[in-house]
Curated annotation (Swiss-Prot):
Protein name, UniProt field: tRNA modification GTPase MnmE
Subunit structure: Homodimer. Heterotetramer of two MnmE and two MnmG subunits.
Keyword NADP assigned: no
A biological process from GO: tRNA methylation
One function term, GO molecular function aspect: GTPase activity
Sequence ranges assigned to domain TrmE-type G in this UniProt record: 223-383
Binding site for Mg(2+): 237, 258
One of the Pfam families matching this protein, by short name: MMR_HSR1
Family to which this protein belongs: Belongs to the TRAFAC class TrmE-Era-EngA-EngB-Septin-like GTPase superfamily. TrmE GTPase family.
């Protein structure tokens, strides 16, 4: 079977660096590496102890020429990440030696690993469950310390323990129902129905606790998609540069300088924010600028938050009003910029009165005035209070969806019991709820979906 092949892949980024690591896992991994390894004083790997390293050289089999100087580490299964015999070859960090060593491993009997196949083997061999496997990629992609800590908690199995606890309780309820149906002479159905409703309400409460922070968790995992919009030359690029502390965007007095979107991540108290600077939205005959304006509108549609910038030194016009109308159904913050010019927008203006004053901030991006207030406003809009790194937060949209479906099935079971329909029909809904939660840990998930999840991993992981 393919799952039992010995696999190999480069585990470090391709390119020049201090070292490269080639990982190999499977029953034949030690034999394969031994066949191309030559230690000091012709020492082999035959007597290498588990969880130790050995210095030597990788040799090309046919020519007997040395490819590179290496350190080989050996982890014996099942006490390894994949729960299989695993070796890692540490060679000099360069494209040529790394590729040549990998080529020799494949010529000697290994197969090139698919993306995420090492982590998939850890899952298939029962070393980790699916939620822990997904946490591996979240750790790699984490943008802030807080998002990394959240992923680490999931990798430790904190979410798995909570899910398994709820599923075990569901199984006990199902067993209780089946016992009641199998022994109707005891006439326990009515008593059992009332007890089950109480149990299900407690389960729903636990699921609700997990769902409640999942929107915040999704932001921790993927970043808050924030788009800066406004007419040309209101200070959008200056705001981006101020937030990232770098001159990423070109700033000039010429309207229409930004013709494409610029994206950068910033960290606000552990919250990853993807800031998108867009082309100024206005009517234009310039073909390139017109494309930029259309891209800006697309980014607004995708945004979690819109920062709408107005220029305090100029009067509001039809273009400002059109932009406001375009974003009115989004979460937004209005920045009244260029406060340093000592001119004041007429705040009695009907347009301003329509805006929620809680979301209006006067700023001078040039002088960094109002930026802290902006950051606090972003936090308050999306996060209820301070996020604690020791709390369990559901960060994965797939997990959130499974929790919601499980909750719906529990509610359906309660309705079935309340309608005094035969109690065994409620067990169908409870079993569905149990199955949906199992999708989080991978116990009840379709194999094709599991394959798709691991295909999104990088090679060597």
């Amino acid at each position: 079977m393919k799952e039992f092949d010995t696999i190999a892949a480069v585990a470090t980024p391709v390119g020049e660096g201090g070292i490269s690591i080639i990982r190999i896992s499977g029953d034949k991994s030690l034999d394969i590496v031994s066949s191309i390894f030559k230690g000091k004083n012709d020492r082999t790997l035959d007597d290498i102890k588990p969880y130790s390293m050995r210095y030597g050289f990788i040799i090309e089999k046919e020519s007997k020429e040395m490819i590179d100087e290496v350190l080989v580490s050996y982890m014996k299964g099942p006490r390894s990440f994949t729960a299989e015999d695993t070796l890692e070859i540490n060679c000099h960090g360069g494209v040529i030696p790394t590729k040549k060593i990998l080529k020799e491993l494949i010529k000697s009997g290994a197969r090139l690993a698919e993306p995420g196949e090492f982590t998939k083997r850890a899952f298939l061999n029962g070393r980790i469950d699916l939620s822990q496997a997904e946490a591996v990629i979240d750790i790699i992609r984490s943008k802030t310390d807080l998002s990394m800590k959240s992923a680490l908690k999931q990798a430790e199995g904190t979410l798995s323990k909570e899910i398994n606890s709820i599923r075990n309780r569901m199984i006990k309820i199902i067993a209780h129902i089946e016992a009641t149906v199998d022994y109707p002479e005891d006439d326990l159905e009515e008593i059992t129905g009332q007890k089950i409703k109480v149990d299900l309400k407690e389960i729903i409460n636990k699921i609700d606790n997990l769902i409640s922070a999942s929107e915040e968790g999704k932001i921790l995992r993927e970043g808050l998609n924030t788009v800066i919009v406004g007419k040309p030359n209101v200070g959008k690029s200056s705001l981006l540069n101020a937030l990232i502390n770098e001159n990423k965007a070109i700033v000039t007095e010429i309207p229409g300088t930004t013709r494409d979107v610029i994206e950068e991540y910033i960290n606000i108290d552990g919250i990853p924010i993807k800031i998108v600077d867009t082309a100024g939205i206005r009517e234009t005959e310039d073909v390139v600028e017109k494309i930029g304006v259309e891209k800006s509108k697309e980014k607004i549609d995708e945004a979690d938050l819109v920062i709408f910038m107005l220029d305090l030194s100029r009067k509001i016009d039809e273009e400002d009003i059109e932009i406001m109308d375009f974003i009115k159904n989004k979460k937004y913050i209005v920045l009244l910029n260029k406060l340093d010019l000592n001119k004041d927008l007429n705040e009695e203006n009907h347009f301003i009165k329509e805006l929620d004053s809680k979301y209006i901030i006067k700023t001078s991006v040039k002088n960094n005035s109002g930026l802290n207030e902006l950051k606090e406003c972003i936090k308050n809009l999306f996060f209820s209070g301070e996020i604690k790194s020791d709390e369990l937060i559901v960060t994965n949209a797939r997990h959130q969806e499974a929790l919601i479906r499980s909750r719906e099935s529990c509610i359906q079971a309660i309705e079935t019991l309340s309608d005094e329909i035969s109690i065994d029909l409620a067990s169908i809904d409870i079993r569905n709820a149990w199955k949906y939660l199992g999708e989080i840990t991978g116990d009840t998930l379709d194999e094709n979906i599991i394959d798709k999840i691991f295909s999104e991993f990088c090679l060597g992981k």
